Curated annotation (Swiss-Prot):
Positions of GTP binding: 40-47, 176-182, 201-205, 270-273, 327
Location of the region described as G3 motif in the Swiss-Prot/TrEMBL record: 197-206
Protein's name in the database: Guanine nucleotide-binding protein G(i) subunit alpha-2
Region span, G1 motif: 35-48
Record keywords: Cell cycle, Cell division, Cell membrane, Cytoplasm, Cytoskeleton, GTP-binding, Lipoprotein, Magnesium, Membrane, Metal-binding, Myristate, Nucleotide-binding, Palmitate, Transducer
PANTHER family tied to this protein: GTP-BINDING PROTEIN ALPHA SUBUNIT, GUANINE NUCLEOTIDE-BINDING PROTEIN G(I) SUBUNIT ALPHA-2
Subcellular location field: Cytoplasm; Cytoplasm, Cytoskeleton, Microtubule organizing center, Centrosome; Cell membrane; Membrane
Gene Ontology molecular function, alphabetical: G protein-coupled receptor binding; G-protein beta/gamma-subunit complex binding; GTP binding; GTPase activity; metal ion binding
Source organism phylogeny: Eukaryota, Metazoa, Chordata, Craniata, Vertebrata
Cellular component GO terms held in the UniProt record: cell body; centrosome; ciliary basal body; cytoplasm; cytosol; dendrite; heterotrimeric G-protein complex; hippocampal mossy fiber to CA3 synapse
InterPro entries: Gprotein_alpha_I, Gprotein_alpha_su, GproteinA_insert, P-loop_NTPase
Length: 355
């Protein structure tokens, strides 16, 4: 009998040891799994960050995948020149060359079929080229804060000769610059520094926020994207609302949300390149009338940073990790994401009592 008991005890001890081992392995695996939630107002650069993760942590875009973006590049280019030409009427800007009025009519006649077919035919690219070279069109482009225009407009239009080639294949940079509105939730997986990342890009959900926000209670960190350059723009869906104010409102609701009490908040003040260019001729007082500093990059950017960080109501227990980013610059995103990962590792160790 004694032998039987000791054999059973031995088996139970083995089982207990195995359970402990499995629990430890599960715990280690869970500690290595990082759920990242990408949030921010529309057109703040969230999807570009996701594309950068594919370039940096996977193998980038294959030639075939790049080809599939050709129609998007054409559509973005056509939509951009159309937006500028349409705005000329509203802003009462004339073409410098009266012949461009015919080109404008041609643009609207040809663009619909071209977009449907995902093409950029020679006659249409010629029309776009002549319009873009017109001084009146350029004058209207310089006033783009007064209407809705893609950030990538000048990038594509200045490179029309290249993208209009019959054998054109988009580059990784062309793909990064494409704009497709995100609807629903896009999930991306990758491994970095022995961590398994799951990144969720939540887009197009302005009115439904209350319904889905609690689903992300267990996320490791939130990356909140803000377009610095949007300080003098209004929303596409609400022309009364300044885009920066909308961003601040959203950040306030996320940063101080009960579901995210223990979640690291990482703030990406994005589009720093566009902001640096714009701040010299479009004053920050458009967005913040109380601002008395210089319209220079460093001072104005620091002011915006403090406006966002001041929204944190739990400063004593919650830190905001802020980075200035240019989502289309792979090296910059790589450097920043490296720093972000170190923060996540440090916080994970802290949670496990190892730091």
């Amino acid at each position: 009998m004694g032998c039987t008991v000791s054999a059973e005890d031995k088996a139970a001890a083995e089982r207990s040891k195995m359970i402990d081992k499995n629990l430890r392995e599960d715990g280690e695996k869970a500690a290595r799994e990082v759920k990242l939630l990408l949030l921010g107002a529309g057109e703040s650069g969230k999807s570009t960050i996701v594309k950068q993760m594919k370039i940096i942590h996977e193998d980038g875009y294959s030639e075939e995948e790049c080809r599939q973006y050709r129609a998007v590049v054409y559509s973005n280019t056509i939509q951009s020149i159309m937006a500028i030409v349409k705005a000329m009427g509203n802003l009462q800007i004339d073409f410098a060359d009266p012949l461009r009025a015919d080109d404008a009519r041609q643009l609207f006649a040809l663009s619909c079929t071209a977009e449907e077919q995902g093409m950029l035919p020679e006659d249409l690219s010629g029309v776009i080229r002549r319009l873009w070279a017109d001084h009146g069109v350029q004058a209207c482009f310089s006033r783009s804060r007064e209407y809705q225009l893609n950030d990538s407009a000048a990038y594509y239009l200045n490179d029309l000769d290249r993208i209009a080639q019959s054998d054109y294949i988009p580059t990784q940079q062309d793909v990064l610059r494409t704009r497709v509105k995100t609807t629903g939730i896009v999930e991306t997986h990758f491994t970095f520094k022995d961590l398994h990342f799951k990144m969720f890009d939540v887009g197009g959900q302005r009115s439904e926020r209350k319904k889905w926000i609690h689903c992300f209670e267990g996320v490791t960190a939130i990356i909140f994207c803000v377009a610095l350059s949007a300080y003098d723009l209004v929303l596409a869906e609400d022309e009364e609302m300044n885009r920066m104010h909308e961003s601040m409102k959203l950040f306030d609701s996320i940063c101080n949300n009960k579901w995210f009490t223990d979640t690291s908040i990482i703030l990406f003040l994005n589009k720093k390149d566009l902001f640096e260019e714009k701040i010299t001729h479009s004053p920050l007082t458009i967005c913040f009338p109380e601002y008395t500093g210089a319209n220079k990059y460093d001072e104005a950017a620091s002011y915006i940073q403090s406006k966002f960080e001041d929204l944190n109501k739990r400063k004593d227990t919650k830190e905001i990790y802020t980075h200035f980013t240019c989502a289309t610059d792979t090296k910059n995103v790589q450097f920043v994401f490296d720093a972000v990962t170190d923060v996540i590792i440090k916080n994970n160790l802290k949670d496990c009592g190892l730091f």
